[in-house]
Amino acid sequence: MNTGEYERVYVELERYSGPLSGVADVGGVPHYFHAADPDQVEDRFYVWPIAPEVFVLERECWAIFVRWNERYELGEAGPESHPGVGGIDERYDELEERLKPSREVPADARLLVGRAEFLIDEEVPRYRVEGCDYAMRWSSP
C-alpha cells in the first residue's frame, strides 16, 4: 500500500518528537494509528478502522481538548486544568472511559509506515477542532 497522498489527521492522542497515536485517514477512511515501537526511529504504526459512532466520540473528546488548548495558549489556563488530568471536565472523563477499549491495538491491525508532513504556517494553530497541523502519508513497510 502506498497512497502517495498525505491524509488528514483528525485527532492526536499521543505525541513525543512526532505523532505516536491518533485518528487519521488511511486510504481516505478514518483509522486509529498507534506507534509500533515509540522508541524506534522508524515510523511504523499499527492502523485499524474506527467505527463511525466511535469516530464521532473521538471528535467530541478532541474538541474539548482543543478548547482547553486555546485557553492554555492564551495564558488563560494552566496545565493543572488540562481535561486529561481527570475530574476537570465530566464529559471528557466519560468519553475517555468509553473510548479506552477502541484505542487498544487489535490483533488484526495492519502495520504501515507513516510519514508526517507538518504545515509551516504561523496562522494555523497546532491543534484545531478540524484536526492537527500535520498530515500523514502511509505506505507498506
What are these regions (language model features)?
Residues Y46-P141:
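Low-complexity intrinsically disordered segments
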